[in-house]
């Protein structure tokens, strides 16, 4: 197990849903900044080109401003980099959401990319859960090991406190499969994070907390 140091900013419950988190271990040094009410701008430096491309899809289609800087042990492989970015992004998202008052909480999205079709269902529940099925047609996409898709989302949900159901329903090209998943994730997350004006700032749970 590695140790980590969190350096957050932003106030829970504030109107600005912005947060910055740093995570430093013997394997990676990661900093993530998110603005949940952004315009989809992204600055991404993970050292893995295809992974940067997927994070860019998340920002663009989620309308989240996202700044990710990671220096990882890529001389070994991409596992620690991808997993730790997922962890740190989850921590930043959790902090930026604050008390979660007024958010829609639940959402889903279907996104096609040519022959590929993916569905993602989100519950911002406070309970981490990942249920993922992507029958990738190839083990690698450029310099990206497709198994790391699971590691990214597992790290993310564990620290964001989100339940995700991710299914690639159709697909032949592995690039298309993965990209349709990330686009659907972005669209569903964007909808779940939207503030519902009819909720009058209430928590979307009969428990009174998420």
Curated annotation (Swiss-Prot):
Q: Could you tell me which pathway this protein works in?
A: Amino-acid biosynthesis; L-histidine biosynthesis; L-histidine from 5-phospho-alpha-D-ribose 1-diphosphate: step 6/9
GO MF terms here are: imidazoleglycerol-phosphate dehydratase activity
Set out the biological process GO terms recorded for this chain's protein: L-histidine biosynthetic process
- Write out the GO cellular component annotations: cytoplasm
Which reactions fall under this protein's catalytic activity?
A: D-erythro-1-(imidazol-4-yl)glycerol 3-phosphate = 3-(imidazol-4-yl)-2-oxopropyl phosphate + H2O
Q: What class of enzyme is it?
A: lyase
Which InterPro entries does the entry link to? Answer: IGPD_sf, ImidazoleglycerolP_deHydtase, ImidazoleglycerP_deHydtase_CS, Ribosomal_Su5_D2-typ_SF
Q: What is its EC number?
A: 4.2.1.19
The entry's localization annotation reads:
Cytoplasm
Q: Which UniProt keywords apply?
A: Amino-acid biosynthesis, Cytoplasm, Histidine biosynthesis, Lyase
State the family it belongs to: Belongs to the imidazoleglycerol-phosphate dehydratase family.
| UniProt-recorded name of the protein | Imidazoleglycerol-phosphate dehydratase
Source taxonomy: Bacteria, Pseudomonadati, Pseudomonadota, Betaproteobacteria, Burkholderiales
């Amino acid at each position: 197990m590695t140790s980590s140091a969190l350096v957050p900013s932003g106030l829970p419950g504030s109107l600005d849903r912005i947060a910055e988190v740093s995570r430093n271990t013997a394997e990676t040094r990661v900093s993530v900044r998110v603005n949940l009410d952004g315009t989809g701008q992204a600055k991404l430096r993970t050292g893995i080109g295809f992974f940067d491309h997927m994070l860019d899809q998340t920002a663009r289609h989620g309308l989240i401003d996202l700044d990710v800087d990671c220096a990882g042990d890529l001389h070994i492989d991409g596992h620690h980099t991808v997993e730790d970015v997922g962890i740190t992004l989850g921590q930043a998202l959790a902090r930026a959401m604050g008390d979660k008052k007024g958010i829609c909480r639940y959402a889903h999205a279907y996104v096609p990319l040519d022959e590929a079709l993916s569905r993602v269902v989100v519950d911002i529940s406070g309970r981490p859960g990942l249920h993922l099925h992507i029958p990738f047609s190839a083990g690698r996409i450029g310099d990206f090991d497709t198994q790391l898709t699971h590691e990214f989302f597992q790290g993310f949900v564990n620290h964001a406190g989100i339940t995700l159901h991710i299914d690639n329903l159709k697909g032949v090209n592995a690039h298309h499969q993965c990209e349709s998943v990330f686009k659907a994730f972005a669209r569903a997350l964007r909808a779940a994070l939207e503030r519902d004006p009819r909720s009058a700032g209430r928590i979307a749970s009969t428990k009174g907390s998420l």
